[in-house]
Each structure stands twice: as structure tokens, then as C-alpha cells.
Amino acid sequence: MIVTETIIRFENVTKQFDNDPPVLDNVSFEIEKGKFYTLLGPSGCGKTTILRLIAGFLEASEGQIYLGDKVINQIPANKRPVNTVFQDYALFPHLNVYENVAFGLRIKKLKKEAIDKKVQEALRFVNLKGYEKREISEMSGGQRQRVAIARAIVNEPEVILLDEPLSALDLKLRTEMQYELRDLQKRLGITFIFVTHDQEEALAMSDEIFVLNKGEIQQSGTPIDIYDEPINKFVADFIGESNIVNGKMIQDFEVEFVERRFECVDQGFRPNEVVEVVIRPEDLEITSAEKGKLQVTVDWMLFRGVHYEVGCIDIDGNEWLVHTTRKVRVDDKIGLAFEPEAIHVMRLGETEEEFDKRLDSYDEVQ
């Protein structure tokens, strides 16, 4: 049995500025030690507010924030075992790489030998050994990020907070840094909490993801869980691309949408309950019209490099997005095939707690 240790806990935390609507509204969650977490959501959803509350840059309006078993609401930022890597890295331009990394240690008045040992070790961890005397202005974007991370880990924090640190990098470098950050977190064994609005970053890097919207956590779980089993339309639409249509759950393992009934793997709904149905674009296969479960007309097509993105319309006017390596032409009449496992049925207004209980009931039956 694997024993996990909770390092950070939010208990009914609300953050409100003046009389404005809450930025965070009664949020509760736990962060386990040694994992890579991502707070994911659109602008204004509350993800950066959570980061600042953990760091001590903001104070909660209501609720308790725990570090281990200790409430830290009133503990100032400089007394928390937490370091933040900011979006702009916040490096000192007048100091070289070595002095940037050593800055926090000098504030603590460590001996010169101890500072040198810690700085060299931090630079080795981020693959910047030999760059000690380099000026910050001479560093690339990726190298500056490594300096910022070295400055964070040199203080041996229990938690590292990363506030959209990849957003200023180009696509190729951003992808490279995703791998580097994930590898670094595994080697260090420190808890990372990463903020982003980029779902691909979240899926690629995280052990656990919290999806936020309008100050509330919509869903939490592993990348695979959230992608394959979204709890509601917002999560399904925000995490990857989705085809979402209205439907009706006829009975266990049978759902109706686009005026046809299909076998599915979902259960635990009321007979004839109104639901929403999700099918991912990559789970749709283009076939001849007569072999398809759905008959559609090709409306448009884009080449995306590794696949074609095909937009289709069925006889009722529903739009369907397909990812395929098969080339078709606009106005072609085609069929769309899919397996029962490709259909995901969502209950309207279901909470995450109710959703988890329903999934547990699946496991018990199986």
C-alpha cells in the first residue's frame, strides 16, 4: 500500500476583493507531497489567486490554508517553505547567473563555502554548470527560465510554484522545457504547482490537474481521467477538442442522440434522463456513408501536419469534428463510425463528488 502525505490543504477558502464577486468561491482541495500539479483554466478563473495564496502574497477572505498540519494564513511569504518562479522570471539584470542564484542564500547570511556548494548543485540540476559568470542579458529565454528555477530550488523549498513560466517561449522551446521541468521535478522529488491556460501543457506534464472556472474547481484528477471522463461540458470543451450533443439515457448501456440509439458503456442514470454526450474527434472513423453509424456531409477540411481536421454536418444540422489521416473533399457524403467506449455520457449539473461516486459504482459492478 502506497502511503501519501498531504503537504498543502485548502479548506473552504474564499478570496474576494472589496465588493466584487469572489475570485475563489469556497474552494477545498489537497496537494500530496512530491507530485506535479497543474492549475488549469481560462483567464480570471482563480488559478493564479490560488498560487498567490499558497505563496503568502494574498490573504484568504475566508477558510483555512494548511501546510502539513499547520494553518499558514497569517504566516508571511518570507517565512513559508515555498518558492515562486514568475512568468517574467524576475531575475536581477545587474547580477550574473551565479549571483542571481546565490541571492537568497546571501540574504540568509550563509557562509561563502555553503553558498558556493548549494549554487553549484542547483546549476548542475538545471544543466547550467559553466554558466556562472554569464550575464542575464546574454541568456536565451530557456536559459533564463533555468536560472529562475535554480534560484528557486537552491533554497530547498518544500513546494515550488510556477506561474505560467513557459508562456513567453516559442512553441519548440516550450515543448522542450515541458520535458525538462517534468524531469527536474522527478529528480528533485519536490512538489511542483504549475499554473497554465494551455491544456496540452497540463496533459503532458502533470500527475494531477485541477480544472478551474469562475472561481471554482470543476474537476480534479489525472490527465487521462479528465480527458477520458470529463464531468461537464466546460471540462470536455476546455480539455482538448470535443463533439458535444444533447441526448437521452434510455437505460444502462444505451443512449439516444441525433434521434438514434447507440450502445455505450455508461450506467447509473435514471431511465430517459436528459444528458449530454461527448465523442472526441480522434475517436471518429471516416467510412462509406452506408457503413457509418452517422451520415454526414464534409463542410471543410484543414491539414494539421500529423492529421487532417475535418468539419462535418449531419442531417439535423449538428456539427462534427473529425481527426483523421484520410483525405476527403468538401461536400463528400461520408459515414462516421465509433465504438461504444468512445461515447461519454455526462449528467447535467453533476458535482464532482456525485461523479466520483458514480464511477466507483462502475468499478464495483465490474
Curated annotation (Swiss-Prot):
Protein name per UniProt: Spermidine/putrescine import ATP-binding protein PotA
Function text: Part of the ABC transporter complex PotABCD involved in spermidine/putrescine import. Responsible for energy coupling to the transport system.
Highest taxon of source: Bacteria
Subunit structure: The complex is composed of two ATP-binding proteins (PotA), two transmembrane proteins (PotB and PotC) and a solute-binding protein (PotD).
Domain ABC transporter: start-end pairs: 8-239
Organism from which the protein derives: Listeria welshimeri serovar 6b (strain ATCC 35897 / DSM 20650 / CCUG 15529 / CIP 8149 / NCTC 11857 / SLCC 5334 / V8)
One Pfam entry name: TOBE_2
E.C. number(s) listed in UniProt: 7.6.2.11
Any GO CC annotation of this UniProt entry: ATP-binding cassette (ABC) transporter complex
